[in-house]
């Protein structure tokens, strides 16, 4: 696979080719997933839950994320490396810049930040300094205590209107990509059409420009036994992990995943 860049992701959106993304935390899985055709490897703060065993993503630090970014970089075969900026790592503009630089120096190609329109200043700061940014909107796990749990966002018309406006504002601030988590499928489609940058969905229907899942979820691995509605176990019927990841890539590309039952209504 040729090296995936911001430019190539934008070209995929323009051509209507779906983008595939998976979380990834080490060299072996980075090699396996990128060889299977996954375009974007996300070192998510989900590592706090699936690797460290916490009940939220909040305890994850920038240093821990940078460690896993470096591991992924060593095994990667051409995929874009996207790294989460952990909880409170962007509390001030100075912290945002320093922590983002740390992740980029570890091997990331793009930084993901969670929030809404208030992120505009941070995104502008990073973009002006050569750091591409993905804006994570909708259900933002770092704000789980404010949101009252892991709930679908944007069901009320006022919320939907605000989310559409925020997405446009963040694109204008310089966001190179948007990730929508747990939002109604119709709203996700509207946002995807409203912005020029690629929009990746998780629990956001099939009309987004691409999909992302947590690696452990799509392989059927869970400590809690709770499986989110938007997850499909791609390990079922497959002889090995790389085949399961290839099945995920194929399903996203041929529009068989996500199906209607993996999304949410308003």
Swiss-Prot record:
SUPFAM superfamilies: Phosphoenolpyruvate/pyruvate domain. GO terms for biological process: pantothenate biosynthetic process. One of its GO terms (molecular function) is 3-methyl-2-oxobutanoate hydroxymethyltransferase activity. Its EC number is 2.1.2.11. Its main location: cytoplasm. Disulfide bonds: none annotated. Keywords: Cytoplasm, Magnesium, Metal-binding, Pantothenate biosynthesis, Transferase. InterPro entries: Pantoate_hydroxy_MeTrfase, Pyrv/PenolPyrv_kinase-like_dom, Pyrv_kinase-like_dom_sf. 3-methyl-2-oxobutanoate binds at residues 45-46, 84, 112. Mg(2+) binds at residues 45, 84, 114. It is found in: Cytoplasm. CDD domains: KPHMT-like. Binds 1 Mg(2+) ion per subunit. Gene3D superfamilies: Phosphoenolpyruvate-binding domains (3.20.20.60). Pathway: Cofactor biosynthesis; (R)-pantothenate biosynthesis; (R)-pantoate from 3-methyl-2-oxobutanoate: step 1/2. Homodecamer; pentamer of dimers. Belongs to the PanB family. This is 3-methyl-2-oxobutanoate hydroxymethyltransferase. The lineage of its organism: Bacteria, Pseudomonadati, Pseudomonadota, Gammaproteobacteria, Pseudomonadales.
């Amino acid at each position: 696979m040729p090296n995936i860049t911001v430019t190539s992701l934008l070209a995929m959106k323009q051509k209507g080719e779906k983008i595939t993304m998976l979380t990834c935390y080490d060299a072996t899985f980075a090699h396996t997933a990128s060889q299977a055709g996954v375009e974007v490897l996300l070192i998510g703060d989900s590592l706090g839950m699936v690797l460290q065993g916490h009940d939220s993503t909040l305890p994850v630090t920038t240093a821990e994320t940078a460690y896993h970014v470096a591991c992924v970089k060593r095994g990667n075969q051409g995929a874009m490396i996207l790294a989460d900026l952990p909880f409170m790592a962007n509390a001030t503009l100075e912290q945002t810049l320093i922590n983002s630089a740390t992740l980029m120096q570890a091997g990331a190609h793009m930084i993901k930040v969670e929030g809404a329109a208030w992120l505009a200043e941070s995104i502008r700061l990073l973009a002006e300094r050569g750091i591409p940014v993905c804006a994570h909107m909708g259900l933002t796990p770092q704000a789980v205590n404010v949101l009252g749990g892991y709930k679908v966002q944007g069901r009320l018309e006022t919320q939907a209107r605000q989310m559409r406006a925020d997405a446009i504002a963040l694109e204008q601030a310089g966001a190179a990509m948007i990730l929508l988590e747990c939002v109604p499928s119709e709203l996700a489609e509207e946002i995807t059409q409203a912005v020029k940058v690629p929009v990746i969905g998780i629990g956001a229907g099939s009309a987004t420009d691409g999909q992302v899942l947590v690696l452990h979820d799509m392989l059927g691995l869970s400590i809690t036994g709770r499986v989110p509605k938007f997850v499909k176990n791609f390990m079922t019927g497959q002889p090995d992990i790389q085949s399961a990841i290839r099945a995920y890539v194929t399903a996203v590309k041929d529009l068989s995943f996500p199906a209607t039952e993996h999304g949410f209504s308003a």
